[in-house]
């Protein structure tokens, strides 16, 4: 048992490091946005979804919901604030129409998280039931986070171009999902296992597409490709 706990701790630390890289991987994209003072054809969807995902996983990792999940809490707490920062850049450089949609989405997320926290803390007493309720919600939003970059796949296949599908983000998503899948297997936590196993599949699909269409991509083209 001690060896298993040590293995979980080591894998969890590795998972935190890779998750950190995942959260930092879009940074070149936002440097590009800031230099151009425009969001161009990049979409905020993955970042807005990840804000909610990190908020819910941070709540799941708190000791009054689940025990011994401090690694889940710390990395998702960091991710929450970083994704808010990314979303803020989108707000700063988006036209009013897109800005309004982002603000409405963030408002809806804030209301949803507040309602979940209130309901769980005031109406659900046992940790087992709290973990079940919050865990199921986390599964749903974790899957959304991993699959949100796939909104670009149709356009990638149509245009035979991966210009607006960031390789670093796809690779980090894949590695992150694989490590947390291993962590979940050691602990046998289905709430962590299910979304991350699907996330590994999502990341693999993105990497395959990148390999297939990399050579056919015109990196100098200015045509609008939605992400």
Which residues make up each language-model segment?
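Alpha-helical membrane-protein topology signature
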Residues: 1-227
């Amino acid at each position: 048992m001690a060896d298993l706990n040590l293995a979980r701790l080591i894998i969890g630390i590795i998972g935190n490091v890779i998750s950190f890289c995942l959260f930092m991987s879009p940074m070149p994209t936002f440097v590009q946005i800031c230099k151009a003072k425009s969001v161009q054809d990049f979409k905020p969807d993955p970042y807005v979804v990840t804000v909610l995902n990190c908020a819910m996983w941070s709540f799941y990792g708190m000791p009054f919901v689940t025990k011994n999940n401090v690694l889940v809490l710390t990395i998702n707490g960091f991710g929450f604030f970083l994704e808010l920062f990314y979303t803020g850049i989108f707000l700063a450089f988006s036209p009013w129409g897109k800005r309004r949609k982002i603000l409405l989405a963030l408002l809806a997320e804030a209301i949803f998280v507040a309602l979940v926290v209130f309901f769980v803390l005031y109406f659900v007493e046992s940790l087992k039931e709290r973990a079940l309720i919050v865990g199921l919600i986390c599964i749903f939003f974790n899957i959304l986070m991993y699959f949100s970059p796939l909104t670009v796949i149709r356009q990638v296949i149509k245009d035979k171009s991966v210009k607006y599908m960031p390789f670093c983000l796809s690779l980090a998503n894949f590695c992150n999902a694989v490590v947390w899948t291993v962590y979940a297997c050691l602990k046998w936590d289905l709430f962590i296992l299910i979304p991350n196993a699907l996330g590994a599949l999502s990341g693999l699909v993105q990497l395959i597409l990148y390999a297939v269409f990399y050579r056919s991509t015109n990196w100098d083209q200015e045509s609008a490709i939605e992400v």
